[in-house]
Curated annotation (Swiss-Prot):
Compositionally biased region (Basic and acidic residues): 354-375, 396-405, 423-444, 453-473
Signal peptide: 1-34
InterPro entries, sorted: EMP3/KAHRP_N
Annotated organism of origin: Plasmodium falciparum
A cellular component term, taken from the record's GO annotations: extracellular region
Protein name: Knob-associated histidine-rich protein
Start-end of Low complexity biased regions: 95-104
Predominant location: secreted
Length: 473
């Protein structure tokens, strides 16, 4: 600081004082005002400024002993200001006034005697400024990084088969070990899908998945037709799923057939995360099924076409896992939705732990996991089939929200009639009519996953294929 005294000050005696006086006063006022506004709660901003000024004052004191009383004031002002500051908003003007006066004094004082003080003070003011000026707010949102892709392990039990399946989220390949147990159909999953938020891979649409496993169908008695093949009783069957897509008639829907599907344009504005380009023509009709899932969470990352499994296979949505596994809908189809679904984006892998089995097992209301539709989807309520018809309008809205997720394309009356509570029934209904379409998917996909399927089942498959051709065409 001393170096300023001899050279610089003499050279700039004329312009420097006036300029700095103005600058300093306004600067002090501004700092004070700002720190009062920004940091009312904690005196930290002020104490920082004043501490700096006090040290300056002491330094000045050392250099120039002839201005004791001026410094006396300078020392006082900070304490006064502090005092007011800590006692709330009322006295905020006081520190400002004091400080301004003293700032001016000081400026005058320097103006006549030694300008070298000004420069350092300016610098120190600048240093003191950011703490009082910018509240320290971390604006960065930290998201937990999750392992990319990952596996979903779930079990399906129906009649005498028990499959433990593990499906790779990325390429849709399943592996499973098949056990034989006497059990009615049940679906349980070990833990939710995990998807890497940063790479924006799309896991399966959990909402659609849940809707396809309502756990307890008794179509046979209701339809008066012959008993269905096992795989047609499975809520996860492709028939049922595609029936949701293609809107085949059932009791609740007035409009039927593909006409009832509401295709969503690729650039749909409503914040669903479809990546428009990721759909080719053949899968356009799958678009939007279940996509509402992403809406509630505002996670709109676009589908990332680079994520597709085999080159040319258009990714997961082309992979229609074969019928044998009971859960045979193409996982990735409504690909946007997995982003927003609570499972894929917002839960860590082990959060729900491996207790999934117990939780989902006999269709206990398993899901603490997903507050949304899942409790209802899994609950046993769907056992009564009239439930479908009398679905309460009370839940209409929820239902719409939920059911649009995976049923966008069914006619709207359909959606309205269903209450979230009976989500499952909705599937129950659809299974009825969905049997047929499942075949469609399966036919051009003839792989059987873990299929040690019995002959009886294959026979039944043929049976329902015929059913399909009558029913759905």
């Amino acid at each position: 600081m001393k170096s300023f005294k001899n050279k610089n000050t003499l050279r700039r005696k004329k312009a420097f004082p006036v300029f700095t006086k103005i600058l300093l006063v306004s600067f002090l006022v501004w700092v004070l005002k700002c720190s009062n506004n920004c940091n009312n709660g904690n005196g930290s901003g002020d104490s920082f400024d004043f501490r700096n000024k006090r040290t300056l004052a002491q330094k000045q004191h050392e250099h120039h002993h002839h201005h004791h009383h001026q410094h006396q004031h300078q020392h006082q002002a900070p304490h006064q200001a502090h005092h007011h500051h800590h006692h709330g908003e009322v006295n905020h003007q006081a520190p400002q006034v004091h400080q301004q006066v003293h700032g001016q004094d000081q400026a005058h004082h320097h103006h006549h005697h030694h300008h070298h003080q000004l420069q350092p003070q300016q610098l120190q003011g600048t240093v003191a400024n950011p703490p009082s000026n910018e509240p320290v707010v971390k604006t960065q949102v930290f998201r937990e990084a999750r392992p990319g892709g990952g596996f979903k392990a779930y079990e399906e039990k129906y009649e005498s088969k028990h499959y433990k399946l593990k499906e790779n989220v990325v390429d849709g390949k399943k592996d499973c070990d098949e056990k034989y147990e006497a059990a009615n159909y049940a679906f349980s999953e070990e833990c939710p899908y995990t998807v890497n938020d940063y790479s924006q891979e799309n896991g399966p649409n959990i909402f659609a998945l849940r809707k396809r496993f309502p756990l307890g169908m008794n179509d046979e008695d209701e339809e008066g037709k012959e008993a269905l093949a096992i795989k047609d009783k499975l809520p996860g069957g492709l028939d049922e799923y595609q029936n949701q897509l293609y809107g085949i008639c059932n009791e609740t829907c007035t409009t039927c057939g593909p006409a009832a599907i509401d295709y969503v344009p690729a650039d749909a504005p409503n914040g669903y995360a479809y990546g428009g380009s990721a759909h080719d023509g053949s899968h356009g009709n799958l678009r939007g099924h279940g996509n509402k899932g992403s809406e509630g969470y505002g996670y709109e990352a676009p589908y990332n076409p680079g994520f597709n499994g085999a080159p040319g296979s258009n990714g997961m949505q082309n992979y229609v896992p074969p019928h044998g596994a009971g859960y045979s809908a193409p996982y990735g189809v409504p690909h946007g939705a997995a982003h927003g679904s609570r499972y894929s984006s917002f839960s860590s892998v082990n959060k729900y732990g491996k207790h999934g089995d117990e939780k989902h097992h006999s269709s206990k209301k398993h899901e603490g996991n997903d507050g949304e539709g899942e409790k209802k989807k899994k609950s046993k309520k769907h056992k009564d089939h009239d439930g479908e018809k009398k679905k309460s309008k009370k839940h209409k809205d929820n239902e719409d929200a939920e059911s649009v997720k995976s049923k966008k394309h069914k006619s709207h009356d359909c959606e309205k009639k269903k209450s979230k509570k009976h989500k499952d029934n909705e599937d129950a209904e659809s299974v009825k009519s969905k049997k047929s379409v499942k075949e469609k998917g399966e036919k051009h996909n003839g792989k059987k996953p873990c299929s040690k399927k019995t002959n009886e089942e294959n026979k039944n498959k043929e049976k329902t294929n015929n059913l399909k051709s009558d029913g759905s065409k």
